[in-house]
């Protein structure tokens, strides 16, 4: 391990993982840089790490650290000046009937069932479509920071979507969203729009969306939420 000198945390270190298959670009190998020790990453520290391009998966805080590749670009949406495009306005209107319930992280068989159906319907063969209960809980229900679970339900009570969101000093970080794969409409888009509205209500300037990859169809949607900034060469800048 070596000192993470670019961050103002004298006690934090980082390590690079071994190469593993990239989930987004075929025939590529990925690596991650993981901040450690995890128990020292509290809400304040985590906020500063996110501002440096890090993300969270369970108790692991990481950012891409790939050999000869910088395709993963952190993205954050300017919630104050955000203006929806036509398809985003349609998504917002289509799902206005959903009711959102904000809660703390907790195990629920209903949530796990929806998560399993989402993975099997949207990402079959992706490695997460057979996650056990413990894997699901480690991924989404384990956190040392200020995290909320948001249920989206139909008026009659049917659960259709769940979002995991971290609350930061300067914004919200959209950790993960899963939804009923059999329902038509842009539920994922609606979740992002709902989070932008929450940023505005809380007077938080940014919604962090994780990584955008130009050549990945899975990530293309993130470029459509404007205005936004991208973290390139250690600086947040607006795309040209």
Swiss-Prot record:
Signal sequence annotation: none
GO biological process: ubiquitin-dependent protein catabolic process via the N-end rule pathway
InterPro entries: Acyl_CoA_acyltransferase, Asp_Glu_LeuTrfase, N-end_Aminoacyl_Trfase, N-end_Aminoacyl_Trfase_C, N-end_Aminoacyl_Trfase_N
Catalytic class of the enzyme: transferase
Keywords: Acyltransferase, Cytoplasm, Transferase
Pfam family, one: ATE_C
Catalytic activity: N-terminal L-glutamyl-[protein] + L-leucyl-tRNA(Leu) = N-terminal L-leucyl-L-glutamyl-[protein] + tRNA(Leu) + H(+); N-terminal L-aspartyl-[protein] + L-leucyl-tRNA(Leu) = N-terminal L-leucyl-L-aspartyl-[protein] + tRNA(Leu) + H(+)
Coiled-coil spans in chain: none
EC number: 2.3.2.29
Localization, UniProt: Cytoplasm
S-S bridge residues: none
Assigned GO CC terms: cytoplasm
GO terms assigned for molecular function: arginyl-tRNA--protein transferase activity; leucyl-tRNA--protein transferase activity
Task of the protein: Functions in the N-end rule pathway of protein degradation where it conjugates Leu from its aminoacyl-tRNA to the N-termini of proteins containing an N-terminal aspartate or glutamate.
Protein family (similarity comment): Belongs to the R-transferase family. Bpt subfamily.
Protein name, per record: Aspartate/glutamate leucyltransferase
Organism: Bordetella avium (strain 197N)
Taxonomic lineage of the native organism: Bacteria, Pseudomonadati, Pseudomonadota, Betaproteobacteria, Burkholderiales
Gene: bpt
């Amino acid at each position: 391990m070596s000192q993470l000198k670019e961050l103002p945390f004298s006690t934090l270190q980082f390590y690079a993982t071994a190469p593993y298959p990239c989930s987004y670009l075929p025939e590529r190998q990925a690596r991650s840089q993981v901040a450690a020790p995890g128990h020292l990453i509290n809400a304040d520290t985590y906020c500063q790490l996110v501002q440096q391009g890090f993300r969270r998966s369970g108790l692991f805080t990481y950012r891409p650290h790939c050999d000869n590749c910088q395709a993963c670009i952190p993205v954050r949406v300017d919630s104050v000046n955000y203006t929806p495009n036509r398809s985003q306005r349609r998504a917002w209107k289509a799902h206005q009937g959903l009711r959102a319930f904000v809660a703390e992280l907790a195990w629920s068989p209903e949530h796990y069932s929806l998560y399993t159906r989402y993975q099997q319907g949207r990402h079959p063969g992706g490695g997460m479509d057979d996650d056990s209960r413990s894997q699901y809980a480690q991924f989404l229900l384990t956190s040392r920071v200020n995290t909320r679970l948001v249920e989206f339900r139909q008026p009659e009570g049917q659960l259709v979507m769940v979002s995991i969101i971290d609350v930061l000093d300067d914004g919200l970080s959209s950790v993960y969203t899963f939804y009923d794969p059999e329902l038509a409409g842009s539920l994922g888009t609606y979740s992002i729009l709902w989070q932008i509205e929450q940023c505005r209500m809380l007077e938080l300037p940014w919604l962090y969306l994780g990584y955008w990859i130009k050549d990945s169809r899975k990530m293309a949607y993130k470029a459509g939420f404007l205005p936004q900034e991208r973290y390139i060469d250690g600086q947040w800048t607006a795309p040209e």
